[in-house]
Amino acid sequence: MSTFKLLKTLTSRRQVLKTGLAALTLSGMSHAVAKEETLKTSNGHSKPKTKKTGSKRLVMLDPGHGGIDTGAIGRNGSQEKHVVLAIAKNVRAILRNHGIDARLTRTGDTFIPLYDRVEIAHKHGADLFMSIHADGFTNPKAAGASVFALSNRGASSAMAKYLSERENRADEVAGKKATDRDHLLQQVLFDLVQTDTIKNSLTLGSHILKKIKPIHKLHSRTTEQAAFVVLKSPSIPSVLVETSFITNPEEERLLGTTAFRQKIATAIANGIISYFHWFDNQKAHTKKR
């Protein structure tokens, strides 16, 4: 029986906390490395394989929406789910060219529940998780890119609150309701390490924004925060990138061009690479102390 299956059977939060601490200490939160063809998760949790020391860094890219969930739709009919999948595939290609193992939560037009997207990242032992979207808003004049990290203290702005509530309703499109089933351990471990994880997520967001700024308008110059379900990973730095507002006619046009999708993908990938360089420098500096 896997650690996660065992912990799910415990009824006391205190028992889960104690066992989770032991698992965290003994395993160092080891994650799985699996083939990309088996990315989709089911309700059954397969036993994870231990990630080998010295293995490539792994970035899990999550193209938002998919299948029955189209995401936002532009005035001319562009669907968010298709645009962000194309961008995510471009980011994957760029990262792989830089020696980084990049994978997608979905490679086609399929629906994946929000919590499953988080679990996919953990099962593959991801070092980073990035959900890629294209904003939809009631005001067609809203424009620019934004980056969001998780918040456990409320949204950092009215826009952040609006977008997180909208994205968190994605499962309802497929008749599913987000529940806490099978996620008690995840919540407990999140409570244990959330401070460092959110801090690193905010840093990752700042690196991405710096790379996007020269090539595209920013809707927000700092990493926003809100309670996005898809960012609720206990130990993996996670951000949600809203590449543009697909409900803005001009930005819908841009998102429909191969050139812009490649340009924004390059900026995102360079932001990830920049973050890894920063992280390595921080780690080296800490060791010297």
From Swiss-Prot:
* Broadest EC class assigned to this enzyme: hydrolase
Region feature (Disordered): 36-61
Print the keywords alphabetically.
Cell wall biogenesis/degradation, Hydrolase, Periplasm, Signal
The record's Pfam families line, in alphabetical order, gives: Amidase_3 (PF01520)
Q: Where is the MurNAc-LAA domain?
A: 59-273
Q: Please tell me where this protein is predominantly located.
A: periplasm
> Which superkingdom?
Bacteria
* Name of protein: N-acetylmuramoyl-L-alanine amidase AmiA
